[in-house]
Amino acid sequence: LPNPYKLNSRRDVLIETISTVLKEQKILIDEASSRPGDGIIVTQPFVFAKGPVITQNELKRYAVLQFADNAWSRGQFTLTIEVQSIDGVQNNVSVNAKVEGRAGNGLTSEWATVQSSGLAEEEFLVKLVEAVTGNSLDEPKTTDQ
């Protein structure tokens, strides 16, 4: 899907729909960072992988890994969703994901930000478009950016 994606819906209704879709995905909204009145919703970090075996594979899906030799133990992403009003009923919705992996080198482990592959953004946009339009879309496709 294009990102930003144009949706026909009143902005306040769209913000409410975004909140509902996030709840359905069990992703919590960071109330302190979000500004719904300005059309900005920020989520709390969503852990999508735990454990070294699963995390390595899931991070390869959600991120572009520069170095494959890190010992990843967890993966998480934070979504920033921005609704920009075009006119009374049309809005552009852009979704950006900050993807992080918890990497360890034996003595310490720390969260490292890695480049998003676009999968987290695509998965959310597909669910949002389905919620707004009522039409079921195909599974998310990876696209060259």
Model-based region annotation:
Residues 1-145:
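Ser/Thr-rich, low-complexity intrinsically disordered terminal regions
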